Amino acid sequence: MLAIGITGSYASGKTFILNYLSEKGYKTFCADNCIKELYKDIVLQTQILKLLPELKYFNIRKISNLIYNDDIAREKLQNFIYPLLIDKLILFKKENTNYKFVFSEIPLLYEAKFDQYFDFVVTIYCSEEIRMQRAITRASFDINIYNKIKEIQLSQDSKIAKADFAINSGVDMLDLEKQITKLIKNLECQV
């Protein structure tokens, strides 16, 4: 089994491509969804409130605002949540060893040094204009958080340079499908 990490800048199309791969029958893991599931655990919520006493009650939007405005709080939360995320990722890989490929979307893959858990990395990219257009359509969009995420993340060009493969999501669906088909063919040569 090959483990493929998918990364990219905010609103670059990572989740769209992960969902496309899932619809095609590939096993997929989404770090953001995993963290949302972890956050539902009352014990974990209590631990986070102790870790971040600035929060009066557990609220994901308040956590986002805090961690994108306070580097120390962000680091504390990452140091707490990343080991749990790694455990879930390792379990996902163990449960799917009978598949040729598994795909995992990890937005901060390089920044959090998650690349060590993957055989190959694919960076999804598109223009800044397209990313902004996509971002503003999200219910949770906040321009300040968007800019802070851009500041925290490696540049799109750096992610492309580090990756084994890159997919331009700023194209029509037919072209995108061609790129994904080419990726799968390239990966099949590696099995």
Curated annotation (Swiss-Prot):
Keywords attached to this entry: ATP-binding, Coenzyme A biosynthesis, Cytoplasm, Kinase, Nucleotide-binding, Transferase
GO cellular component terms listed in the entry, alphabetical order: cytoplasm
Pathway where this protein functions: Cofactor biosynthesis; coenzyme A biosynthesis; CoA from (R)-pantothenate: step 5/5
One Pfam family matching this protein: CoaE
Chain residues that bind ATP: A11, S12, G13, K14, T15, F16
Family membership noted in the UniProt record: Belongs to the CoaE family.
UniProt name for this protein: Dephospho-CoA kinase
Native organism: Rickettsia typhi (strain ATCC VR-144 / Wilmington)
Gene symbol of the encoding locus: coaE
